[in-house]
């Protein structure tokens, strides 16, 4: 199947009408049989992270009715706040059979300011890759995890290292 990745910020800048357009975009793409990756890059903790996860990937109960918010198939998540920020998303993914793409090594020019920092002899992105593999081990599909990684194609050598660290992640 083919996938699309609408960037939510391009819709958010237009306020409520923009968010309504985002929902229409997601619904239209799903009607066409496309996999929808919500490029939301959320990162928060506790109940806030859970609310983002439910709003984009899960269902919320209101009285006797259940609603799916934006209803993407996958969402992008920023892991900077650690497991407190990722676990609520992973829980919703397990429950709803949805997925995540966690930022590991991004392609933007300044990504190395943090992602390439050496910690315990290895770059930070390798440590993040290990956490993605751990989180992913708890969310396995047939062969691959529902938890994947964002790894910029502009860094093929780093990609090879990360593939070894995360062999079951897309």
Protein language model regions, located:
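Conserved, mostly hydrophobic/aromatic
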Residues: 4, 39, 75
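A C-terminal functional module that forms or caps the active site or interfaces directly
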Residues: 153-170
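Short coil/turn connectors at secondary-structure junctions
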Residues: 1, 6, 31-34, 70-72, ...
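Alpha-helix-loop-beta-strand connector modules within alpha/beta enzyme cores
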Residues: 16-38, 164-165
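Conserved anion-binding
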Residues: 44-148
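Domain-level signal for soluble alpha/beta catalytic cores
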Residues: 27-41, 46, 70, 149
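Glycine-rich, proline-tolerant flexible connector loops at the mouths of alpha/beta enzymes
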Residues: 5-19
């Amino acid at each position: 199947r083919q996938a699309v990745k609408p960037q939510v910020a391009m819709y958010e800048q237009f306020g409520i009408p923009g968010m309504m357009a985002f929902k229409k975009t997601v619904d239209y793409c799903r009607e066409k049989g496309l996999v929808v990756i919500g490029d939301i890059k959320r990162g928060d903790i506790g109940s806030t992270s859970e609310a983002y996860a439910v709003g984009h990937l899960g269902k919320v109960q209101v009285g006797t009715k259940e609603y799916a918010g934006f209803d993407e198939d996958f969402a992008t998540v920023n892991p900077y706040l650690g497991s407190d920020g990722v676990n609520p998303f992973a829980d919703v993914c397990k429950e709803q059979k949805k997925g995540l793409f966690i930022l590991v090594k991004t392609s933007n020019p300044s990504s190395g300011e943090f992602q390439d920092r050496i910690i315990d002899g290895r770059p930070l992105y390798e440590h993040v890759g290990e956490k993605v593999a751990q989180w992913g081990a708890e969310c396995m599909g047939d062969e691959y995890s529902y938890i994947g990684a964002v790894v910029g194609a502009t860094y093929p050598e780093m990609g090879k290292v990360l593939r070894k660290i995360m062999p079951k992640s897309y």
